[in-house]
UniProtKB/Swiss-Prot annotation:
Role summary: Bifunctional inositol kinase that acts in concert with the IP6K kinases to synthesize the diphosphate group-containing inositol pyrophosphates diphosphoinositol pentakisphosphate, PP-InsP5, and bis-diphosphoinositol tetrakisphosphate, (PP)2-InsP4. Phosphorylates inositol hexakisphosphate (InsP6) at position 1 to produce PP-InsP5 which is in turn phosphorylated by IP6Ks to produce (PP)2-InsP4. Alternatively, phosphorylates PP-InsP5 at position 1, produced by IP6Ks from InsP6, to produce (PP)2-InsP4.
GO molecular-function terms, A-Z: 5-diphosphoinositol pentakisphosphate 1-kinase activity; ATP binding; diphosphoinositol pentakisphosphate kinase activity; inositol hexakisphosphate 1-kinase activity; inositol hexakisphosphate 3-kinase activity; inositol hexakisphosphate 4-kinase activity; inositol hexakisphosphate 6-kinase activity; inositol hexakisphosphate kinase activity
Region of interest called Disordered, as start-end residue ranges on this chain: 1-33, 93-185, 1106-1146
Residues holding substrate: A197, K198, R377, K378, K414, R428, S492, F493, V494, K495
Note: Present with 8810 molecules/cell in log phase SD medium.
Protein name: Inositol hexakisphosphate and diphosphoinositol-pentakisphosphate kinase
Polyphosphoinositide-binding domain: region residues: 530-597
Family indicated by similarity: Belongs to the histidine acid phosphatase family. VIP1 subfamily.
Biased composition regions of type Basic and acidic residues, renumbered to the chain: 110-120
Residues that, per the record, bind ATP: 278, 351, 358, 377, 402-405, 412-414, 430, 475, 487-489
Pfam family, one: His_Phos_2
CDD domains xref list: HP_HAP_like (cd07061)
UniProt gene name: VIP1
Amino acid sequence: MSGIKKEPIESDEVPQQETKNNLPSAPSEMSPLFLNKNTQKAMQSIAPILEGFSPKTSASENMSLKLPPPGIQDDHSEENLTVHDTLQRTISTALGNGNNTNTVTTSGLKKADSESKSEADPEGLSNSNIVNDADNINSISKTGSPHLPQGTMDAEQTNMGTNSVPTSSASSRKSSTSHPKPRLPKVGKIGVCAMDAKVLSKPMRHILNRLIEHGEFETVIFGDKVILDERIENWPTCDFLISFFSSGFPLDKAIKYVKLRKPFIINDLIMQKILWDRRLCLQVLEAYNVPTPPRLEISRDGGPRANEELRAKLREHGVEVKPVEEPEWKMVDDDTLEVDGKTMTKPFVEKPVDGEDHNIYIYYHSKNGGGGRRLFRKVGNKSSEFDPTLVHPRTEGSYIYEQFMDTDNFEDVKAYTIGENFCHAETRKSPVVDGIVRRNTHGKEVRYITELSDEEKTIAGKVSKAFSQMICGFDLLRVSGKSYVIDVNGFSFVKDNKAYYDSCANILRSTFIEAKKKMDMEKKNLPIIREEKEQKWVFKGLAIIIRHADRTPKQKFKHSFTSPIFISLLKGHKEEVVIRNVNDLKIVLQALRIALDEKAGNPAKIKVLANALEKKLNFPGTKIQLKPVLNKENEVEKVQFILKWGGEPTHSAKYQATELGEQMRQDFDLLNKSILQNIKIFSSSERRVLHTAQYWTRALFGADELGSDEISIRKDLLDDSNAAKDLMDKVKKKLKPLLREGKEAPPQFAWPSKMPEPYLVIKRVVELMNYHKKIMDNNFAKKDVNSMQTRWCTSEDPSLFKERWDKLFKEFNNAEKVDPSKISELYDTMKYDALHNRQFLENIFDPGLPNEAIADELGSHSLVDRYPINVLAKNNFKIIDSHSMNNSGKNSSNSVGSLGWVLESGKTSTARNPKSSSQFDEPRFMQLRELYKLAKVLFDFICPKEYGISDAEKLDIGLLTSLPLAKQILNDIGDMKNRETPACVAYFTKESHIYTLLNIIYESGIPMRIARNALPELDYLSQITFELYESTDASGQKSHSIRLKMSPGCHTQDPLDVQLDDRHYISCIPKISLTKHLDMDYVQQKLRNKFTRVIMPPKFTPVNITSPNLSFQKRKTRRKSVSVEKLKRPASSGSSSSTSVNKTLD
């Protein structure tokens, strides 16, 4: 463009600050674009505004947020501290020679006023107190900092646009011993031989950590790699062994190990085989005079099977295993079963003899309506469903038939022994009531502690003794003052009960100490030469990528303009810019008002933006993104103006992140405690991500171990990337037609086969949205909405609730015009309100009784009565495949969950059951529940496709978005491999990097245990982990393996049903293995083979400006300076050395 007065800026110099003198003083300096009268008038109106600010680029690049040193706070102020209160901020610029860093530090530490907490923000975590984005940091002093060890970086980084950025390295935390726990004389070593998923479960972690905290015991976790791949001669030796069967566990192998090493065992491994056959369990219980319900048996398999070893054990307990012939049986009538002359009348319970088969049927008497109920492993919030066609017993397989008993209070009792003299018991709602599972915030079934009667305590002791299981769970029924055992579950712990954890640890401690005394006496009397074996595979390192915790719904308005007024806001940049500072947002608001006055664009669009920006101006996290569109001459022809707000961390985020940090600390204490000495933490610059990283870090190290560690900002790795924008836009254009009438989804779209086509689902959602809009408007007009909910999260109120929903109602008022990108906003909002505004949700969408006429247009039936549910969610995020981990020959096509999704019943009863778990089970909320279900379906099958529909698109978008992060992770793992001590690197980021990184992994060709279309929703705090293990052979040669895991995060299938407390948070689902243990070089090569598929653009993150320049002055030399990788510091800085900075200048 000609005719522009240029201000010369040296191409090798970064301006530290632009002043008012840099700004145009009159419209005569502007581009010919501005020569028409309206434009001149508009720019003359803007000119006075420009006198009040100094445009400059942000100085923040990569930076570190430091946790405070110990002792700056007392315990009583803990709850009042926010991220801002507990972080020191440093901005680091690595000099070009790489020998030192300059660190700019601001203390910014202050004690929060506890009296300032509002009723709406009981945790003192209002968003106004949370640390601002990394861009809004002012520095006041400089301090020296020793150079940090540089991670292994390869030549590939020259393609990723980050070779001038500091590598993933940060100072390591050194644990403090300001409050050391008392140390006691060492007793011995506890070996834990069980599948990792069980060993690292919450109860096991708590109990083992209690055992080792005073130094009496050390633990050795055998681990899946050793258990499955190593010979028992190479398994580590121990004094005491905790071992038990679960899916995939090689029980016979563990039995051979016990015979070889003879450790003290708390649960007899051979006797655990009894639990596989319900017939044997019942025979053992009878031998010990434990009451059980009356029963009949139909064995079509020849009876229970047992090897000689197990037969010998059973004989010791008075049970003889004999072959059994198939009995004569018949149904005398529809209600009476006869087996070998003995009869049983309905209702009765039909149980498979296989102890691992939970498909249990209950048959009801015809006089009570007939039919039956199918019980199954808990799926989401269901554990059973009624089937009116269930009349005749199954004729294939072997079954036990027990007389059905009406239990007291419709409850079952779950009992947990720790030896013969201790038993903890809890009640739960029986699954036969309505099949609805009540869950707490940890995702566990709601239970209540109950006191056992003397008779029940005696029963518990007999169960523990009969099965030779010190730790053993079993189920009781209480019927008219008597108790009956109906199932024995074997090794199991109580969940989420600290008193139980304490009791269990104390009893185990005493047991182990007594056992060690006997073992030592035996050694004295009969010296035994024991071979000592250390752990074969040692946990060496961890790279973990974590999505941020719970947030408010993200909202935005997006419009495009060609007016020079909007183009001038770019400050001459030709890439995306971001504006966050409140003063700068005020200037943009003034520009919008001027543009409205001068009709510089569609008035309706401008008015929407101006009104929204005025309301949200002071909201934390409000920002404007300006995305230029260039013509063939590389000049800006229009600007996409995007106003965003929301997406702020909620009060729940603190609890979620803290809990995850505590869990990881417990894992490290068990796997390799020395890893805590070398942990590096990185975060994107967004507030919700920083907030998560900070609370996770504090919990990981403990309040008494805060040191000088840093949370380092890595925008280049973890912030939004524009590199895949064009490709993602193309994919989004493909998604729109799929939602239109008559369009069938392509095969790779993976739409559930038995669901109506996407258009019909969208159409129904639009109908439901229109219906609920009328209800909400009616209730706002006729009811006192301010009294519906007394406490609000994140400073909301009824008007803001209505504003959010009104925006969604406009987006979903026409099935032909629904934008696929709005589906995530709908699902986001619905999930948020189900957790944080449930009381208001219930009241504002209450259609009233009797139902009003507006309900007639919907009809009385749902679109479908069976909804797709993720296979992993169906199995409670457990991989139910006993062979998958033993059969290395299986490829990914046979991996668990290859079908991905199955249909589950979504029917609800027509009348609310008094024992029902949720107010939303009432018929008047049938449409609201349907809306939630259908929004979930659309979210699951539409939103992940924004990152690619075809495999090629998924890989390309994945690489363009997360290639720098993927490369850095491999560099980190290589660095860990070469270290003598273990290490951990944690990356905190947002959803897009989680999905795209997973797509890279899946497209790399690494054999996976979970098919990609079986991956569940990746919710808040979802994680991807790379675990590194090391083995050293006799010659000193080292081998390394990698195992990939993932967690779906803080997820619930049914947010309307989960029972909440005031914290409104859902716990994190434990990690599940994506792969077996694989050779490290193999994994790295598989991933690197895909890296060369794309070439990263020289710049792929948005410019962040602190003050928009409304003059639209073209500055070619400035753009030139932005594009270079090495920029010299001005001479005034006192250094002539070049500075290596991030290519992205803010």
